[in-house]
A protein has these predicted regions:
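C-terminal motif of bacterial Sec signal peptides marking the signal peptidase cleavage site
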Residues: 13-16
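Bacterial signal peptide processing site
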Residues: 18-21
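Non-transmembrane domains of secretory- and envelope-associated proteins
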Residues: 98, 137-193
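Sec-dependent signal peptide recognition
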Residues: 2-8
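Extended beta-sheet lipid-handling architectures
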Residues: 41-46, 56-63, 75, 82, ...
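An acidic-aromatic
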Residues: 72-119
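Flexible, processing/modification-adjacent segments and terminal tails
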Residues: 99-147
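Post-signal peptide N-terminal segment of mature Sec-exported envelope proteins
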Residues: 24-49
Length: 193
């Protein structure tokens, strides 16, 4: 009888030690080598210089990027650090908000084909910004480098990079802003040169 009780006790202990959790396999999404080279987040400060007829105009700002989602550029007024303009680029569209004149342009990838170099893609912008953040990378980009030949004289200097996680809230345009055409915006920008 003792032997049976002893075996039952061992059986109960062994059954009680069995894990109730089951192992399941989860699929890890495949990432290409070029995607793996791009950090999930990238931020930097920037200096935009636009040479004009009466000299050049420079303005500072910030750049934030969440890979494969959006790039947000804020151009800030010197000293006061008030936002003058915001440019938000996603894989499908570009939003340019002129905070000073309360106007904006929202253009799709197809609408931008007229002013951008051929085959300009969001992934190319990500690669340019990522390469600039690497030691020895090209940190001064021209309008031509960015795929905007009409603004080839403009220069963007990127510095003070960070790959820490950050929050990028999509830009919402309120009814106080007036939508203008892409052609009107380009005329205004080219007139500065």
């Amino acid at each position: 009888m003792n032997r049976i009780a002893y075996f039952l006790l061992i059986a109960v202990v062994l059954v009680g030690c069995k894990s109730s959790k089951r192992l399941t396999a989860t699929k890890v999404p495949e990432v290409t080598a070029s995607e793996a080279a791009i950090p999930s987040y990238l931020a930097s400060r920037l200096q935009l210089t636009i040479p004009g007829k009466g000299g050049s105009m420079s303005v500072g700002g910030t750049m934030k990027m969440k890979s494969r989602e959006r790039v947000q550029i804020s151009l800030l007024m010197p000293i006061l650090r008030t936002e003058l303009a915001r440019i938000e680029v996603t894989p499908t569209e570009v939003l340019f908000v002129d905070r000073m004149n309360k106007r904006f342009v929202r253009a799709t990838k197809n609408e931008l084909k007229e002013i951008l170099s051929k085959n300009v893609e969001f992934s190319q912008l990500e690669k340019l910004l990522t390469d600039a953040s690497k030691p020895g990378g090209k940190t001064e980009l021209s309008g031509k480098d960015l795929g905007i030949p009409k603004l080839e004289k403009a220069k963007v200097q990127l510095y003070d990079f960070s790959t820490k996680e950050l929050s990028i809230t999509p830009t919402e345009v309120t009814s106080r802003y007036r939508q203008v055409s892409l052609e009107e915006l380009m005329k205004m920008l080219v007139a500065l040169l």
